[in-house]
Amino acid sequence: MAIINMSDLDLQGKRVLIREDLNVPVSNGVVTSDARLRASLPTIELALAKGAAVMVMSHLGRPTEGEYNPEYSMQPVVDYLAKALSCPVRLATDYLDGVDVAVGEVVVFENVRFNVGEGKNNEALSKKMAALCDVYVMDAFGTAHRAQASTHGVGMFAPIACAGPLLAQELDALGKALDNPARPMVAIVGGSKVSTKLTVLESLSGIVDQLVVGGGIANTFIAAAGYNVGKSLYEADLIDEAKRLVANAKSRGADIPVPTDVVVAGEFSPTAAATLKSVSEVADGEMIFDIGPDSAEALAKIIESAGTIVWNGPVGVFEFDQFGEGTKRIAQAIADSKAFSIAGGGDTLAAVDKYGIADKVSYISTGGGAFLEFLEGKELPAVAMLEKRGA
């Protein structure tokens, strides 16, 4: 990939516009989860260290486009950055016709979604943004799958468009996991529905040695193997699809293992009583909420021998402890593995946090939808733009 990297550029005295993903939860004007802000700090600090005048932009929440709404203001982010960075940080509300920013200063633009044309990648808006800078830095992997004015259009018209360290790191890690993986390669794909992850499953079943399915997705594969799944969440209309994926994997010597034992309950609730059963013994009134210990051990062994691990989604309803043992065992196996491991997707990150294995995973992806689209083998518009500008 012929992408220019920000770290290779001379930014002394340059006006640098950085698109970050600073879309964080805010309550009563205070940021309540700062993971994305912390992830963006090294990029902003590097631009300052290189002698740049720094402008930062992002979306926050889903305001009505073109309408100012104080609920979605970037002010809480500005307050956070002002404490985290040892330099002046201020909010610019009216910036499209020009903004004063000095070397060593950080100006944060108000929510890009307050601009008419952001979502549709409007050319006039993109050109206005591009005119504000000497160098545009795309550093928001979490929005790289969206072709919008602040993530794509601006980069087409800026004098120079490059990848920030966070985005470059993300692309390197994903490339390492998918383009030239150390074998055996194992992918764990959980989630409630096959339909939402079908293209991911198809793409991965063509490259992995073992494809582990979990959650509601696994129930459809259990049903496809001829077992009763009771009242479990599953998709009857996708049973043939599941059979086809299993056959395709087998034809290339790969495997999609089905659990041999499961944890069931009669209702979905934090206090539901968990019962361990063989997969062949699920009754009509029961729902499968986790894999059993034998299945978890079998999967742990698969993970143990892996060279590359891609993890997207838990294997059970881990939010309730009685249905969390399967996900916990898998998390532990990934933590103990010497393989290159990459984890991504909201629920996955919650599991990584719950079981305290963040420092044992080789790379944790910041992008939800972008991570999935990369796994699907889709071209990410922002990455395509950077490749075009780098050529």
UniProtKB/Swiss-Prot annotation:
Major enzyme class: transferase
Listed EC numbers: 2.7.2.3
The reaction(s) this protein catalyses: (2R)-3-phosphoglycerate + ATP = (2R)-3-phospho-glyceroyl phosphate + ADP
Family of this protein: Belongs to the phosphoglycerate kinase family.
Subcellular localization: Cytoplasm
Pathway: Carbohydrate degradation; glycolysis; pyruvate from D-glyceraldehyde 3-phosphate: step 2/5
Residues bound to substrate: D21, L22, N23, R36, H59, L60, G61, R62, R113, R146
Chief place where the protein resides: cytoplasm
Binding positions (ATP): K197, E319, G345, G346, D347, T348
Subunit structure: Monomer.
GO-annotated biological processes: gluconeogenesis; glycolytic process
Organism placement in taxonomy: Bacteria, Pseudomonadati, Pseudomonadota, Gammaproteobacteria, Alteromonadales
CC per GO annotation: cytosol
Keyword field contains Ribosomal protein: no
MF GO annotations: ADP binding; ATP binding; phosphoglycerate kinase activity
Annotated keywords: ATP-binding, Cytoplasm, Glycolysis, Kinase, Nucleotide-binding, Transferase
Annotated protein name in UniProt: Phosphoglycerate kinase
Record's keyword annotation contains Hydrolase: no
Superkingdom of source: Bacteria
Database matches in Gene3D superfamilies: Phosphoglycerate kinase, N-terminal domain (3.40.50.1260)
HAMAP family xref list: Phosphoglyc_kinase
One Pfam family here: PGK
InterPro entries hit by this protein: Phosphoglycerate_kinase, Phosphoglycerate_kinase_CS, Phosphoglycerate_kinase_N, Phosphoglycerate_kinase_sf
